[in-house]
Amino acid sequence: MSQNLTEEQIAEFKEAFALFDKDNSGSISASELATVMRSLGLSPSEAEVADLMNEIDVDGNHAIEFSEFLALMSRQLKCNDSEQELLEAFKVFDKNGDGLISAAELKHVLTSIGEKLTDAEVDEMLREVSDGSGEINIKQFAALLSK
């Protein structure tokens, strides 16, 4: 559950959780979840909070215990790390910082470094995510890497 969290993170989460656990019951209401997450620097949408509640409130009591909250925060931080890594990888290719990378440059990298792909494989991948402009934005890049 919280094996990938540091003691410092757990303490920070416990402090934030306790601020909203007004009656010291060891749980917070579903409506307070988004506020707690925002106080910790995350920015979940209402839909994301609803999805998270469906996943972690398995007993349907509309309350989140600290252990459930830790598991949730651990997962959220992992997702944020992945998003940050993706953004950093994109920036490597986005030389001029305009939010776009050339499909030709990306093709060169994918066919020459790491697990080398063939021209045909790269062309197929680019065809699936590209809008035909010859450039790839961050969303298309994410879609490409998830293939």
From Swiss-Prot:
Residue numbers binding Ca(2+) 3: D94, N96, D98, E105
Cited Pfam families: EF-hand_7
Binding site for Ca(2+) 2: D57, D59, N61, E68
Keyword Repeat: yes
Annotated Ca(2+) 1 binding sites: D21, D23, S25, S27, E32
Record-annotated EF-hand domain positions: 8-43, 44-79, 81-116, 120-147
Record flagged with keyword Transcription: no
Entry-linked CDD domains: EFh
SUPFAM superfamilies: EF-hand
Keywords per UniProt: Calcium, Metal-binding, Repeat
InterPro entries: CALM/Myosin/TropC-like, EF-hand-dom_pair, EF_Hand_1_Ca_BS, EF_hand_dom
GO cellular component assignments: myosin II complex
GO molecular-function terms, A-Z: calcium ion binding
PROSITE patterns: EF_HAND_1, EF_HAND_2
Transmembrane segments: none
Miscellaneous: This protein has three functional calcium-binding sites.
Function: Calmodulin mediates the control of a large number of enzymes, ion channels and other proteins by Ca(2+). Among the enzymes to be stimulated by the calmodulin-Ca(2+) complex are a number of protein kinases and phosphatases.
Homology family: Belongs to the calmodulin family.
UniProt protein name: Calmodulin
